[in-house]
UniProtKB/Swiss-Prot annotation:
It is a multi-pass membrane protein. Homopentamer. Channel that opens in response to stretch forces in the membrane lipid bilayer. May participate in the regulation of osmotic pressure changes within the cell. Pfam families: MscL. The keyword Transmembrane helix applies. It comes from Brucella ovis (strain ATCC 25840 / 63/290 / NCTC 10512). This is Large-conductance mechanosensitive channel. The lineage of its organism: Bacteria, Pseudomonadati, Pseudomonadota, Alphaproteobacteria, Hyphomicrobiales. Its main location: membrane. PANTHER family: LARGE-CONDUCTANCE MECHANOSENSITIVE CHANNEL, MECHANOSENSITIVE CHANNEL MSCL. Belongs to the MscL family. The keyword Ion transport applies. It is found in: Cell inner membrane. GO terms for molecular function: mechanosensitive monoatomic ion channel activity. InterPro entries: Mechanosensitive_channel_CS, MS_channel, MSC/AndL, MscL_channel.
């Protein structure tokens, strides 16, 4: 049973998947930082200083000025967080689209290289005839 598990865990696809998950996690953190630390402040500046992380609709309780306070007081719809996560998702989806497109292009290049055609029977017989003719002349 241990041997079966070892074969399963060390298969090429399993290791590739593990590496992909680790890199994906790191990439997700990088995209989060890009969105929260670079893109959203620029969008906030363009839109007149709007802080998307603090945009919400309070459904219950006394009106609050921060999302954290509003969540403590009752139900909220944090649409600012949704906008941030949507931008985050779009960046990740775009990068994955580009990676898949690149992989498909590389696969097509590999498939496009035709294997050398095997010589036909006629070509082989012609070559044999020519060799025999040379041997008879010599």
């Amino acid at each position: 049973m241990l041997k079966e598990f070892q074969e399963f865990a060390l298969k090429g696809n399993m290791v590739d998947l593990a590496i992909g998950v680790i890199i994906g996690g790191a990439f997700g953190g990088l995209v989060n930082s890009i969105v929260n630390d670079i893109i959203m402040p620029i969008i906030g500046l363009i839109t007149g200083g709007i802080d998307f992380s603090n945009m919400f609709i309070q459904l219950a309780g006394d009106p609050k000025t921060t999302l954290a306070a509003a969540r403590e007081a009752g139900a909220t719809i944090a649409y600012g967080n949704f906008i941030t996560l949507l931008i985050n998702f779009m960046i990740i989806a775009w990068v994955l689209f580009l990676v898949v497109k690149l992989m498909n292009r590389l696969k097509k290049r590999e498939e496009a290289k035709p294997a050398p055609a095997a010589p036909s029977e006629e070509v082989l017989l012609t070559e044999i005839r020519d060799i025999l003719a040379k041997q008879q002349k010599a």
